[in-house]
């Protein structure tokens, strides 16, 4: 008996009338989002799209980058898997896909239905058929004329930028003009003159965003840490000859607190005028709270009263003349001058030797005796006290020079700097020693005793007397008070506490205060050692100092001439390669045997620690830091690890005048732009091992929906990266689609050419030659409907396979370790490589790394990131460990594919493997065919397919909203009817979107329900009727099952049981 499925279409649900409750679906116009078209882009009143029942959508003005990379949490949300019913019917198993959704809905208990709110209006579904409902967004196409309209405007923007800065960057302008000419040439010679955006390919875009490949790469600039500066007129211009010093060393008056204006300047004036009074301490705390970003949890806030009490005692350790005069050197200089005045005439650079005698000598020694009686310290240069001091200082100076790599440097002795390569014990040294003793003695008379927990009086005396300036002394008193109160720490306090506010203020006035506290007061603080890490990596969005910053970058590429890939790895390998080989043959666990990939080679490429190319070599005679490195800047290196690959360490300079430019979209938001010549597409950048020193820059720009980006700095960078290798994006589609199209085609062409070289009759090309040929390959773009299509077509072309594969089913067989090897062996070429005893086909099996790690959504534990790669050495077939991350945020080919360029010696192409090498080969195949991979359960991106589609449509021709319902049937055989609900629609898009399921056995076709009626493309009968519904005339759509039987409320559960 035929059954019927009822759909009621009404303007608004007024009450739970019987006519409504008996219908399976109710479609209303309540809450419908108004259409809005802006400059040819069809959209909505986006304010009305926030937080509607249905998809879990956040505010429309959130950036697309934040939307994709941040986890979105919605109350009452749960995941759904739109295609599971069809997959169960088709494959009798669950197929993990990319279009999962997070749904938020609400039960309407009166209607006994479930409410969702798509853009077309509120909809109510009966519970038994609701689980098979999902939402879809169509990214509409834009006219090509509008897509191409930005080309001339970009050139105009950079011309105006040059005028604004009054600096013409000839290289940049030349690049932009080259790009314009290349794009126009492609449009004229290859692309259609009229039409609409060719394709969007949301699935591939989605995957490339997940894999961090939707964009380009540019080098980190490793610039001198902001704590350091280059000493002028010292050393040479080359980075290796620089002399640098800490910015906080020397005159503190370069600080903002001496600028003459501003709150920090006003606070300094008050401290110097009023000392550390209660009111001054309160103002110091209030200032620090405005800027404090501490997020610690340390309990027990120090009170104002306790701080006043501490300071009352600690300030007595500050020499009186520092308080009175307030000048840096007053106390020491005044005392020293007075002492020198009473001395006999002497050569102060000679050793301190003097005997008692008549006249002036007699008076001098009388003064020394008087000093001893008055202060209890014998400073007679002929007595043991001075000689003991000479011995102690000499040992200290010798130790300091040894620690400085044998180079002379300066050490603070008795409050002054002394060179380590001079003989200690001169008259000057003796006077400085006596001066320091006098300062300690004079201060000690005024010191108040206090029961400190951690501080020691003798250290406080020595420390305060060695400091420069009363301001520094007072601020350090506060820091020391906190150190003592919290018994040995000055960090980890709660935000807004008195302690955290004081430390913030001290840090702003004296950024290097922690080091000085440790060195001068003998306290124990945990400090990050940065003296050997002088350089830090920065990107184009980093902040740079006004006066400019200096450092270096890594550049790399491939040279064409004079290189041969048919060579073995030789002397560049260490003994660890043999150790690993033996460990594998003995059956030891891979994770226990494998080491850092760098350990298998003698050379150091700095891929793990690129910020440490230049290290501290110690200090010069002026206490400036000198640099050392085994590499030279501006020298091109050709590593024996690779063939045509080169890299160079180049000096860089980032200045506001040259590098600061405005953003195209936010014209008042400046950023610092690096040299275009270094930019690389991700596909090409990953061919080099130094991709670890580069930054991935994505193209996720603008709001997550409702904003059209015509051009942006990120898109310029992408275009410049392509232009560097002779390629341009296509302009027969929108910029989002064209950016992914060129990237996926480059990857496909590169991988096919690289691994096809291992076929017996193929050309043995270097990467440089391959890159040239690939640029020709990608002039005509291949179309890949999904990432899996790209993945399988690449695999088939490498193994010369022309079968028509069922994409989803075959992909899942490759993913499953139970069926992976069996599926791979269906490729004749793969099976031939497995069975062959020759070296060259064996090396082609390195393609297994691509097969395994380039699957979509795969997750690899970073703790097990080192995996095997086969290489040909002078000793035969061997294996090394490679890093599949290579310091990147995601899985990257750059950690292993550079090693594939070198193949084997020409004489070994037909060489048969030994028994041990065959054992290694079998182990290698088993390793990758049984390597278990986790599907990435990435909470931040796994449920954002429709949000991404909406962003794409917003940047092209607009967005259409659909609700799709699958109605399963059970007789005469299992099948499904697709019912699609929309306000307006394009039936061709729906048919294309659902084609894979509409063409399967058991499909009953689709019925499109929209405002104007229905479009029936199914085998069932559908009628449009009128129904009088409590005072209003509504539309009722009845779908008759005919000879088919719609599933009952338990059918979905029965279908799911088949997947277990």
Curated annotation (Swiss-Prot):
Keywords: Capsid protein, Inner capsid protein, Virion. One of its GO terms (molecular function) is structural molecule activity. The keyword Endoplasmic reticulum does not apply. One of its GO terms (cellular component) is viral inner capsid. The gene is Segment-2. Coiled coil: none annotated. The keyword Hydrolase does not apply. This is Outer capsid protein VP2. The VP2 protein is one of the two proteins (with VP5) which constitute the virus particle outer capsid. It is the major target of the host immunogenic response. Belongs to the orbivirus VP2 family. It is found in: Virion. It comes from African horse sickness virus 4 (AHSV-4). It comes from the Viruses.
